[in-house]
């Protein structure tokens, strides 16, 4: 699968069906092009999935975003500069056959999102936090040491990762989506709780694809671009009003469609030119 399909979306679709831990050997310009096309798809799918909130409300449920009074410029910096890097480290740095990367992702993800243990046992909050940090540090190190000892016995971690890359990929996307449930208040049956974060779930699949197929920093850039485009709407609303946000929404619909269609149009023009040259 190291060979690239004609259209980036076809490559992404094949990867979704059968994830393979193979890095594309394309040049930087081609990789940036793939990134832009895949993020365009992500934007469109995220906007479509966001419409599920309307379906939920029609069905008698309720999903409301948690409102936090934050300066829009600070929110912009956090969403565009800080969140992409930190979230990619936590959720997708470990999507590579590297035990150090696995340790960093395991430790940071567990400290931040895993259940906090023995809360009633410690009266001092500092001791409680310190115990949990130490516990998850030891647990993460233990998992990585297990794979290290297996390597010493001839069972390479790279082979294990390549075999189970699909589990790494899909589990990572799910773990990325679940913490975003805290961004909403909802009244839903337990089996529908995942619906409000389906855009984040698809985002996890998109960023995971970029990380595995292109590299870690391409995943960061894709995440940054995605957050930038969506956060700009909030900033425009704050400074220019709802009309500016509506205009930006139209831009977010039209531009990704054009980007997704461009490779097909270029390929068609190339085929027409080839036929003309052959007929001369």
Where are these regions (language model features)?
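Short amphipathic alpha-helical segments, especially helix-boundary/capping motifs
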Residues: 26, 56, 67-69, 180-185
């Amino acid at each position: 699968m190291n060979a690239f399909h004609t259209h980036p979306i076809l490559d992404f679709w094949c990867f979704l069906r059968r994830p393979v831990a193979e890095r594309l050997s394309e040049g930087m310009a081609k990789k940036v092009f793939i990134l832009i096309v895949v993020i365009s798809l992500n934007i469109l799918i995220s906007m479509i999935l966001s419409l599920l909130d309307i379906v939920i409300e029609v069905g008698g449920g309720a999903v409301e975003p948690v409102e936090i009074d934050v300066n829009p410029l600070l929110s912009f910096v956090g969403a565009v500069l800080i969140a992409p890097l930190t979230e990619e480290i936590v959720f997708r740095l470990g999507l590579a056959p590297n035990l150090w990367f696995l340790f960093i992702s395991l430790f940071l993800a567990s400290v931040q999102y895993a259940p906090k243990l023995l809360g009633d046992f410690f009266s001092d909050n500092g001791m409680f936090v310190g115990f949990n940090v130490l516990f998850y540090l030891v647990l993460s190190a233990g998992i990585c040491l297990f794979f290290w000892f297996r390597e010493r016995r001839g069972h390479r971690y790279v082979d294990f990762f390549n075999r189970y890359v699909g589990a790494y990929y899909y589990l990572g996307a799910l773990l990325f989506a679940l913490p975003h449930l805290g961004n909403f208040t909802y009244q839903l049956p337990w089996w529908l709780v995942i619906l409000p974060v389906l855009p984040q779930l698809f985002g996890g699949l998109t960023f995971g694809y970029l990380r595995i197929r292109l590299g870690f920093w391409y995943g960061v850039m894709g995440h940054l671009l995605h957050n930038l485009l969506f956060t700009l709407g909030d900033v425009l609303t704050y400074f220019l009003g709802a009309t500016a946000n509506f205009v930006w929404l139209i831009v977010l619909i039209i531009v990704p469609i054009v980007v997704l269609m461009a490779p097909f149009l270029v390929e068609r023009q190339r085929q027409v030119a080839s036929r003309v040259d052959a007929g001369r």
